[in-house]
């Protein structure tokens, strides 16, 4: 009901139960109304059906004429009625409706009499029909149409009303106009195969009054089956098979409420009177219960809803549990108590009085009770299973049941079914009344069992064609041959949906107190776990107890009665010891983990936290320098801005960026249980010709036909195939999952968010494509496959070392783009900081490399080819060393949705930092589940900063605004200009578990991070002073054979802080919250874990104290052949040029020694190349002073096409600034050191030319100038070098512009007049 519903506050209509009352009260009224309506209809129809009881008294008469062949006689009418009334609950299992039906206005007119005042005309039987009941046969379960309502309203009570609408339940479709008798007989074989076309949500309770039904059930069924033709076919067969059940219920209950069978009519009248009283009491906020309506009690009703939309079922059109008012709750409680008492006694008396005409009456309750014993969810998954198994039992030689279609299968009385089945209702507690009734019933079961068998042995000869059954029913078909087997099958199917016993700590009350015969096991309350759907709360427990239950099976006789798709092979009494331990152990283990987590993180040192005042919070570098020495021992600190500093985060929701896909379970060690099983699956798929590079993704769409696992924009969640396979096996296999429609449950267990579009269909598709063939392998094949994968892994590690140390050539593409600044060569900045793979230059470069290094790289090429061949041979293990993959381009809005869905996968509510931290390290260390999250780094130069940048916006010029910080006068990086990833801030966009692995900035630069918005971030830090110890510890922990530990750590490896602390390394921890700064100091090793969706912004800065550390870091990167984001040579020369004019003696004194060392190395290498025979050299500048600008423009600009990234040395990735050696024809660049190695090796300098920016005189002049100003106070000159010292000459502003240089063709020797000035 919507919130606006109460506006229609019109309550004067006494019987209009839809207006002006709360939903909860409306459902209560509906239930009681329905009881009264059913009795009212029964009392009137009884006059038309007086002959039914007499005909059904014979043991065979009603079975042969009324139930089995009822389609050819009036008895079918009776069965149809009985089915519609008593079989309402039966629909809950077999009905096809999947969705909760909506309430339509037309339900008020679907059947006027039951929902109308007493003056409503009574619909009389058509006198032209053969019997007073024949017209009821034409009732359909199809949903009535509006036109039919109008026809019915206009013509009701008149002979003009069509016979098929006499009781209004079907439209005049061609399917409904067919003879119902012929339909039933022709379509009976399809009952079992089509019984699970859909999954009803809730069940409808039995309305057993007198064995006659107010044309309810069959009409209801036909309506529900309208959308599906197969479901239509099954409805007829179900109607036919259900008549016996309802008839049996009605007559047995009649016997229980009357002295003998001859007084049934009087009992019906008394029941009618009581029900009328009941309606009147409910209208007066009181509620009673009649003897004959125990099955429609409130407690029974509240857990079920009927999918039908007509008014006949308004008493049960509800979903979920009824929320009663206090007064009504008490009344309903009394009604339930009365129903329970009457039901227990009536069931026993009915059994003793009516067992002799089982052929007709004792079968009326058939399958209805068990469906009511559990909630609609359990019924929906068991709809097909129970229908087919029971049908096969009844049709094929069952001897204990009274029905041929398997509805009873050994149920000996209507009350027996009710009492036995009630305790296993899903999601509800078992009351003491039901337990007592069920115990009382057990005493009668044994004494009456033999008589029931004798009277039902003739049933198996009935004329019903067997229907083609599913796999499970086929097996049951061949096994249910004897009375023992039949009764066992009855208990199997009866208990198919009792999740409480399966997941609870102990089985609910059951009849073991009463002695049971060998053919009737004492486990009617013991569920068959494979065929039941547990409560939502217990859904997660199923996977942990399936295997334990399967191992506990020891009874082969009972096992033979199970189906091939059954998940559990045992029908022994439930062993509660198998159920609670997994859950208890898991809870205890979680608690122990929490305690360990608290202890481990308490051992970590906390970082300093500073809270500057508004006055101190002005210049960040000045403020940080005040406590720099104190904090460097921790590696980082946290700064809490003043309360009045809160800039608004302004980001474009539609900005797009490329994400990283992080496999969290592989961030520690690459190999684990989950990865191993996934490798086995991939290896098996490869043998089948199926390639699977990554796990499939459930979401909006798939991208490729073979893999279909590209990153999905909305709801993209990678499927854990290894766990998926285990869950399917735990649920009984693919066939069991398909039969019981457990895909939704599987999706919930896999924690796939419901917002993912078509998650169930794609989950099923993923299983069929990737897992079905694997799960069909025998245990021997699985073991062999696992051994082969382990052998491959061990062989791979023997060749290349641990997986964590394997190189990944594509790791640069996952890092933050590093851009080359505009340094004067061509005025261009590179787009992504790495080689721009244009087609033509790439081809030329590759060709030049082949020609230049044909001899030198011959051995290396052979090794590379061998490595490629090895990786091809490795097959499924070729990428096991990877844990971070490139994602797809998404918008910020889409990323937020993915982050939200990911959070829902792992946490039910917003978690705290400690909870995320605990689960994160459990995933990393245990590696038993597949966890993939996304992470993004975005350049603010392209997409904009989160800080205000407008001149008029507040905080746009504040010193702590990270877009302003790079230009701070105290930061020496300002001399570099705009370098994305260094002096241009970048955004870090993460979600829960998004990780920045242990790392140290490659240039040892400090940086500041500000958390704009979102969840907390957990930071860990190791100070720079722990570097040596950390290298040894990591080398030992990762078993790095010859690989330095720090290099291993840089390959995206996460090691728990607890482990590092045990090894004696100081680790500090802090939690950054929104609006706080984290400052990381030079050389510190840090890692970060996001606790949810968050957006932070980071930028580097550097003070003069960093220069020595940065210079050593640059030399280390060159030796390790790692590309640097900027040139250290350029930074030194730019600082020297700018600070010499400002006479900043502090900075000059810091860089003077570094500048001298750089000059000495440069001059030495130039001299060595000259001596090795490299005589050709040229200087690149803006233009040659001996030529006019016009002549310069006419010359071909050969090097202008080369972008900045091409000036990296092709050997060591060193960014050449002062000089380089080029191969003119092939555009290949060397640094001086690598060029010297090449010339010495090949003894040939053909085609090589050295290009230099500054000549020797200029370099010496700049070094002397810097040294002189740095030591002016002491009055001494100690800037000694290999080159003569000359005073710097004055240079005009025009020559100062020569720093902006473009590459042009140069003469072989530099012009003597081209003396560019350096200022």
UniProtKB/Swiss-Prot annotation:
<feature type="compositionally biased region" description="Acidic residues">
    <location>
        <begin position="173"/>
        <end position="185"/>
    </location>
</feature>
<feature type="short sequence motif" description="GSGFP motif">
    <location>
        <begin position="944"/>
        <end position="948"/>
    </location>
</feature>
<feature type="region of interest" description="Disordered">
    <location>
        <begin position="396"/>
        <end position="478"/>
    </location>
</feature>
<dbReference type="GO" id="GO:0003677">
    <property type="term" value="F:DNA binding"/>
</dbReference>
<dbReference type="GO" id="GO:0035097">
    <property type="term" value="C:histone methyltransferase complex"/>
</dbReference>
<feature type="compositionally biased region" description="Basic residues">
    <location>
        <begin position="1"/>
        <end position="11"/>
    </location>
</feature>
<dbReference type="GO" id="GO:0010468">
    <property type="term" value="P:regulation of gene expression"/>
</dbReference>
<feature type="region of interest" description="Disordered">
    <location>
        <begin position="1"/>
        <end position="23"/>
    </location>
</feature>
<feature type="domain" description="ARID">
    <location>
        <begin position="671"/>
        <end position="779"/>
    </location>
</feature>
<dbReference type="InterPro" id="IPR036431">
    <property type="entry name" value="ARID_dom_sf"/>
</dbReference>
<feature type="region of interest" description="Disordered">
    <location>
        <begin position="50"/>
        <end position="130"/>
    </location>
</feature>
<feature type="compositionally biased region" description="Polar residues">
    <location>
        <begin position="109"/>
        <end position="121"/>
    </location>
</feature>
<keyword id="KW-0156">Chromatin regulator</keyword>
<feature type="compositionally biased region" description="Low complexity">
    <location>
        <begin position="554"/>
        <end position="570"/>
    </location>
</feature>
<keyword id="KW-0678">Repressor</keyword>
<dbReference type="GO" id="GO:0006338">
    <property type="term" value="P:chromatin remodeling"/>
</dbReference>
<comment type="function">
    <text>Regulator of histone methyltransferase complexes that plays an essential role in embryonic development. Acts by modulating histone methyltransferase activity and promoting the recruitment of histone methyltransferase complexes to their target genes. Binds DNA and mediates the recruitment of the PRC2 complex to target genes in embryonic stem cells. Does not have histone demethylase activity but regulates activity of various histone methyltransferase complexes.</text>
</comment>
<feature type="region of interest" description="Disordered">
    <location>
        <begin position="351"/>
        <end position="382"/>
    </location>
</feature>
<dbReference type="Pfam" id="PF01388">
    <property type="entry name" value="ARID"/>
</dbReference>
<feature type="short sequence motif" description="Nuclear localization signal">
    <location>
        <begin position="96"/>
        <end position="102"/>
    </location>
</feature>
<feature type="compositionally biased region" description="Polar residues">
    <location>
        <begin position="191"/>
        <end position="200"/>
    </location>
</feature>
<feature type="domain" description="JmjN">
    <location>
        <begin position="607"/>
        <end position="648"/>
    </location>
</feature>
<feature type="region of interest" description="Disordered">
    <location>
        <begin position="173"/>
        <end position="265"/>
    </location>
</feature>
<keyword id="KW-0805">Transcription regulation</keyword>
<keyword id="KW-0217">Developmental protein</keyword>
<dbReference type="InterPro" id="IPR003347">
    <property type="entry name" value="JmjC_dom"/>
</dbReference>
<feature type="compositionally biased region" description="Basic and acidic residues">
    <location>
        <begin position="413"/>
        <end position="424"/>
    </location>
</feature>
<dbReference type="InterPro" id="IPR004198">
    <property type="entry name" value="Znf_C5HC2"/>
</dbReference>
<keyword id="KW-0539">Nucleus</keyword>
<dbReference type="Pfam" id="PF02373">
    <property type="entry name" value="JmjC"/>
</dbReference>
<dbReference type="Pfam" id="PF02375">
    <property type="entry name" value="JmjN"/>
</dbReference>
<feature type="domain" description="JmjC">
    <location>
        <begin position="954"/>
        <end position="1118"/>
    </location>
</feature>
<dbReference type="GO" id="GO:0048863">
    <property type="term" value="P:stem cell differentiation"/>
</dbReference>
<feature type="compositionally biased region" description="Basic and acidic residues">
    <location>
        <begin position="74"/>
        <end position="88"/>
    </location>
</feature>
<feature type="compositionally biased region" description="Basic and acidic residues">
    <location>
        <begin position="221"/>
        <end position="251"/>
    </location>
</feature>
<dbReference type="InterPro" id="IPR003349">
    <property type="entry name" value="JmjN"/>
</dbReference>
<feature type="compositionally biased region" description="Basic and acidic residues">
    <location>
        <begin position="583"/>
        <end position="598"/>
    </location>
</feature>
<feature type="region of interest" description="Disordered">
    <location>
        <begin position="549"/>
        <end position="599"/>
    </location>
</feature>
<dbReference type="GO" id="GO:0000785">
    <property type="term" value="C:chromatin"/>
</dbReference>
<comment type="subunit">
    <text>Associates with the PRC2 complex.</text>
</comment>
<feature type="compositionally biased region" description="Basic and acidic residues">
    <location>
        <begin position="798"/>
        <end position="811"/>
    </location>
</feature>
<feature type="region of interest" description="Disordered">
    <location>
        <begin position="798"/>
        <end position="818"/>
    </location>
</feature>
